[in-house]
A protein has these predicted regions:
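Interfacial segments at transmembrane-helix termini and the short loops linking adjacent helices
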Residues: 124-140, 325-355
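Helix-loop junctions and terminal segments of transmembrane helices
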Residues: 77-93, 106, 268, 272-296, ...
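Membrane-water interface segments that mark the loop-to-transmembrane alpha-helix transition
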Residues: 23, 27-43, 65, 69, ...
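Transmembrane helical elements of multi-pass membrane transporters/channels
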Residues: 27-44, 164, 170-175, 192-207, ...
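Membrane-interface junctions at transmembrane-helix termini in multi-pass inner-membrane proteins
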Residues: 134, 144-167, 353-380
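Hydrophobic alpha-helical transmembrane segments
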Residues: 134-144, 165-213, 382-386, 400-424
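Interhelical loop/hinge segments that connect adjacent transmembrane helices in multipass membrane
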Residues: 2-25, 189-190, 205-246, 285, ...
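Signature of the first transmembrane helix
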Residues: 3, 23-81, 176, 233-260, ...
Length: 443
């Protein structure tokens, strides 16, 4: 065979691989999207019901407790939803190392769960709303424990995303059905958290048993657990700090003002975060492949980064514009009478969608796969602190709009900072291109 024939053969093989790879990526993203939409739409059907049954004050109390629970989830996950996925994506062909990672991550998560117990006790002592409504705190903690121990990272790292995604969606469906059956009056709000905690517990128990059926079972170890916590600490700082301007906004707002204001802001934020979460399946489909390619094929990883910007960035701009224009209709349908003041809050928060879309591309799909956790985490810590400071300055005067302004400022700081970091590392924004000499930075 001549050299030109060899070149043509190699080119044909590369094209064939590229088509198969893109087909698999598209298939994973599509399946994840279906599962995610199922898991999102069904509980989202409960929002109009809960907003009306619980009224703004009761709905605000529920969102306050959910917000605290979701922040506890970040503590228990300790960044392993990203660092664990990244590690598994790189060693998935090595059964021995895979078993060691599973053993280490599970040990670390159990330790992190134990750390949340004093945090929860402190919240009960220090927060009047929790002292007056202990059932909300208890079930919020139990939900966090179940969700935080999820072994999704193991399956996602091997690009086996579909079954776990549908299992979680199924748990949400069951919880949503329970809401319609068991939540009838404003005092029943805690039952929403209880149903979510029980549904998630069943799903996570099944997935954990599935994971351990594929790897050797090893008893959790304090020493190994602390070692894994140390290895994932930089991503945990990023995750925990980002929670201060993502998951914990309703909780922060509830510390400053009354539950009714939390209900107005939280209702608008729930709508906009629901839209933003539709970007998650795409990000989950790209992340393990980009992490794998960043080590083995940087050229392919660069192409994937551009592809993720087109899809994630493009969709986020469309969704942001749509949510701004449709805000009055969305509030009327999803929240109902008594929530009219949430319309301008929702319109302001619609700016978050494209900001977070761009930030996701340069943060999750570039900074983490290439090992830039430290500068990324630094930006997120700064944004989390800024969000808290602005919240305490703006909320007493502007209420929910003050909280919205605080969140937007924090998210914009992260997105702009990541773009600057990308340029400083030799990247190009147009056309999007990573530095040709860029290497992986391990921490």
């Amino acid at each position: 065979m001549t050299k030109s024939q060899d070149d043509r053969t190699g080119e044909a093989l590369n094209k064939g691989f590229s088509k198969r790879f893109q087909s698999k990526l598209a298939g994973d993203a599509a399946a994840l999207s279906v599962a995610h939409v199922l898991g999102l739409v069904v509980p989202f059907l409960t929002v109009p019901y809960l907003a009306r049954v619980l009224r703004p004050e009761g709905f605000g109390l529920l969102l306050f407790a959910q917000s605290f629970g979701l922040w506890l989830v970040l503590v228990i996950e300790f960044g392993f939803d990203l660092s664990g996925t990244r590690i598994v994506s790189r060693i998935r062909e090595d059964p021995t190392r895979l078993a060691e990672v599973v053993f280490g991550v599970q040990s670390a998560k159990i330790l992190a769960l134990l750390l949340t117990i004093p945090l929860t006790v402190a919240a009960f002592i220090a927060v009047p709303l929790f002292r007056e409504n202990p059932a909300y705190l208890l079930w919020g903690f139990l939900f966090a424990g179940a969700r935080g121990l999820s072994p999704n990272w193991y399956f996602f790292g091997q690009e086996r995303m579909i079954a776990p995604a549908f299992l979680e969606a199924g748990g949400k469906v069951i919880a949503a059905v329970g809401v319609f059956l068991l939540v009838k009056i404003p005092e029943d709000g805690w039952r929403v958290l209880a149903l979510q905690a029980l549904g998630m517990s069943v799903v996570v128990a099944y997935m954990t048993r599935w994971m351990h059926s594929e790897v050797s079972w090893v008893r959790p170890s304090l020493r190994v657990g602390f070692h894994m916590l140390k290895k994932s600490s930089s991503i945990f700082v990023f995750r925990g700090s980002s929670g201060l301007y993502m998951q914990a906004n309703a909780f922060v707002l509830g510390l400053i003002t009354n539950p009714a204001v939390v209900g107005l802001f939280g209702g608008a934020e729930r709508i906009i975060r629901g839209g933003i979460s539709l970007l998650q399946p795409l990000s989950q489909a790209f992340f393990p492949r980009v992490s794998h390619s960043a080590v083995n094929d940087p050229e392919e990883a660069g192409s994937l980064l551009g592809l993720s910007l087109v899809w994630i960035g493009g969709l986020s701009f469309i969704m942001g514009a749509a949510s701004f224009l449709a805000a009055p209709v969305l509030v009327n349908i999803l929240l109902g009478p008594g929530y009219e003041s949430a319309v301008p809050i929702l319109q302001a928060l619609s700016v978050l969608v494209p900001i977070i879309g761009v930030g996701t591309v340069f943060g999750i799909q570039w900074a983490l796969p290439w090992g830039f956790e430290l500068p990324f985490s630094g930006l997120v810590v700064l944004a989390g602190a800024l969000n808290l400071v602005l919240a305490f300055l703006l909320v007493p005067r502007f209420g929910g709009m003050g909280m919205a302004s605080s969140v937007i400022t924090a998210e914009a700081l992260v997105a702009c900072g990541l773009a600057v970091l990308f340029l400083r590392k030799g990247g190009s924004l147009w056309p999007l291109r990573i530095a040709s000499t860029e290497t992986i930075h391990e921490h």
